[in-house]
Structures are given as structure tokens and as C-alpha cells.
């Protein structure tokens, strides 16, 4: 009888990536098949996030529901991973004894052994250690699910912003070897992936080892990925301004595969607040980066993160943030009211901003950025946009839907054979959350660049010798 696995994922794209790897890993080692119904599962996994407020309460609320399922089925195994698990460790089991497995972001590759331990000994296991990059060496080959894919290139962060838990839950920065990354992307390209999103908590700090003992910079990695035939779009998330060096900006000048859209978190427009956050840059320095980017790629759109109501934020501080929003003309943002994360330096700061004031500021900020996003969308009417077709439209299965470089959903009339390919469409109308387009040309009529086939990348990157040790084949 087939064993079923249910995974609940909260949080960032890195967590989504990790959850997909868990599913692939447990399918290969234990034969688990995914189910969307928790009641059907033999194994329940919760991949948690601790960035936002009340993360712990949210976890224990769901575990209370899963406890009832375990009372009905004592053989059910419950596992909790991610950043809350990394923070709480053994204390998590003290509040939720129904949990059998507790693992951190860096130990998900050990899940098969942990599950075996529970099944053989009927005792729980906790592993929230930081074994650096080991997990990537023990995960199964990537499996494409559509024309887009996430690829993790590094883990952790060394910046220690005062509001952030990432360095404590995911560890400090560790970069994957460049050839391992190219090997994974080439495998995905061979399966039909056309767009990759390179992931890392501080992705532009990437410094990966090469086969010959050298170091590959993030800018160099971007060019190597762009050279793989079939990979015609590259995104990356998330960046830090102090690591956004000129060599990365130069890639925007000469590498069209790198999309004209960048998510670059700034958090605040007030230098005083940025200093309290330990962001290590000023608002003016952030604007200088954007100015150079727009010189290299005039049509680039910028999105960002904002924290409203950081401890001690005055009305003047907030007005400086709003000025930055207007000056940069952000397209979209992920903006939140500040909530203290246990164990971070900012959690000890006196919070003298009222909840009502925080909510009002957040509303003003989000409303302004929404207006700017609509202005950008309206300017797209009459333009020709290259769209990667992802599938049928949500509202009309007789139509297709895809995304532009700046992440706009476009619905248009087309044929099913276009799914997974690029098309050029003329934008004719704008809606609140999508655009309407008319098909102009298909991929067969385009001149997409071809540099190196996925098969040749696979052939020249990581191989294994007779005892399973990775070797490089030039």
C-alpha cells in the first residue's frame, strides 16, 4: 500500500524550494506520495517560517489539529522543520509532544534517517545542526514542474540585521560550488525549464568554489547560467544593497536573459532607522545603486521590502521612507508592520509607536506603491511584451496565461502547444491584477540565443567515480 506524505509550507521561496526537495527525497527513499489531504497522510511535515509575528503560535495551533489525527492513527509520524524548529529545538516537543521529528533548514537531507529512527525505536529525534552545504550533496536530482524553477545557490546570512532571525536559524553564508549549480540548472533545462530563479537569503553575496579551486562571483555565475541553451530568463531573490556591486550591474548591460525586474530590499528610507537596523547603507547609497542600474537597463522595475513602525520610528522617519518610495517609483513591495523576533537585538528596543499609527503608516505606504504599480501597468498598454506561457488562464480555461519580465500576469488567446514557451503579445488592457494581450508571434518566430546545450553542461560538470566521489570533467 502506497504511503502518503503531506507537507505544509509557510514562508519564503527558499522554504518552497526546501519542501519540494523533501518531497523528492522521501519519494526516492521511502516511496512517499504527496497528498493535499492531511487525514490521508502517513507522514505530516510542517516547514515553518519565523520572520513574521506570532509564528510560534501559528505552528502550535496547527500541531494541535495534527495531534487529533495522531490520536486516531498512532502510527502517524509528525515532523516540524524550518526556522521555528531551528529556534525552538527540543522546547518545541515540550509544548507539542506529538512531534516525532524536529529538523532545521540545513538538516532536511537527513529526514530519511530520522524517519527510520522513529519507526525503529518509537522515540523522537531532534537535529537542528548546521552541517553547511552537505544537504545539497544528498538530495535527489531536480525534477521540473513547469517552465519555471527555483534553484538554491547559497544558504544563510552574515549581515545580522537587528530585526532578523535568519543568521540564527539558517546559519551564516555558505555558497554551493558553481559547477553543482550549473549541473542542476542544466538538468532542469533538459526537462524543459525556461526560467530559473536563483535563491539565497543574501543571494548576491554568492562566492562559490570552482572545480579548479578558484572562486566564482555572483556576476560570473549569472553569465554562466545565461549561457545554457534553453534558459532564457534569470531571476534572483533576495539581494542586499551592500553586496550589489558594479560587476553585477554590468551583467544587466550585456545579458538579456537577466530580467528587467529586481527585488532589492531597503526596509526604510530613514538613515537613522537604517542605522538602528544595522543595514550598513544609507538611503542615498541605495538610490545610487538604482540610478546605476537604470543607466545599464533603463526599463528595469524595482520592488522592495519595507518594515513600518520599527522601534523609535518617528513621523519624520516615515516621511523619509515615503520620499524614497516616490523617488525610486517602486513597482511592488512586501511591506509589514514591525514585530519583534525573539533573540534579535531589536527585540530589546523600546517600542513607542502605537499600533494604530503603525497600521495607518502601512496603509499609506501600500496604497502609494499600489498606485505606482498601476501607473506602470497602464504605461505597458500598446507595448509588445515577451511572455513565458505557464498554463491556462485561471478564469477562462480556453485562454492562456503567462508572465512578463516584470512579473505581470497576461491573459491572451492561444493554443495549448504554446505552454512552456515564449510568445510576444501586445498589451491592450489593464486590470487590477492582470493584463490583457493579443498574440503577435510565437517562439518559432523569435531569435533566442543558443550558447551551450544542457547536455554539454551536464557532460562537463559533476561526475562521480567508482566510489561515489564527485569529480570534474573538463
From Swiss-Prot:
Per the record, its GO cellular-component terms are:
cytosol
Residues where [4Fe-4S] cluster 1 binds = 12, 49, 83
Query: How is the cofactor bound, in the record's words?
Result: Binds 2 [4Fe-4S] clusters. One cluster is coordinated with 3 cysteines and an exchangeable S-adenosyl-L-methionine.
What name is this protein filed under?
Answer: tRNA-2-methylthio-N(6)-dimethylallyladenosine synthase
Query: Which compartments is it annotated to reside in?
Result: Cytoplasm
| Quaternary assembly | Monomer.
Name its co-factor(s): [4Fe-4S] cluster
Protein family (similarity comment): Belongs to the methylthiotransferase family. MiaB subfamily.
Question: What Pfam families does the database record attribute to this sequence?
Answer: Radical_SAM, TRAM, UPF0004
This entry's Enzyme Commission designation comes to 2.8.4.3
According to its UniProt entry, this protein's organism is Yersinia pseudotuberculosis serotype O:3 (strain YPIII)
The taxonomy runs: Bacteria, Pseudomonadati, Pseudomonadota, Gammaproteobacteria, Enterobacterales
Keyword terms of this UniProt record: 4Fe-4S, Cytoplasm, Iron, Iron-sulfur, Metal-binding, S-adenosyl-L-methionine, Transferase, tRNA processing
Annotated MTTase N-terminal domain ranges read: 3-120
